[in-house]
Amino acid sequence: MSKKIEFIDLGLPSGRLWATENEEGYFTYDKAKEKFGEMLPKPEAFQELWKEGRWFWDVKNKGMIVVGPNNNTIFLPTLGYGGSEGFNNRYSYGYYCSSDFRKDISCPIVLNFNAEAVWPESNFHYSCGLSVRLCREV
């Protein structure tokens, strides 16, 4: 994490702050946990963002604009995921890594969305590269 991470207050009940940008690149669950540690969102952070935010599909930029209770916003691009054969679902789905892992099925828990729906606690393939948006507990 060589660049300075900027955070924004969305006015969420927890006081949690969200990074204004994604981390550059795609990360497997293990690499994300190793590199970002405590700043990797817990599933409850994604749940809060989903429940408390207003989500709007941005047709031009292909992603979700999330408006917090205080009207501040973040943009979550749909960057798909990195697999063994390159990138998949780019510009149609967003897959964001959380800090948690389901051992019973060997899958990280992710925030997943497309133009029609948001799944704040989805499961995803262990070895795939995911997007990362950091948050900070206050």
How should each PLM-predicted stretch be described?
Residues 31:
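Tryptophan-rich substrate-binding surfaces of secreted polymer-degrading and adhesive proteins
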Residues 9-13, 17:
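Extracytoplasmic/periplasm-facing segments of secreted or lipoprotein envelope proteins
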Residues 1-4, 16-26, 35-138:
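C-terminal, surface-exposed recognition/capping segments
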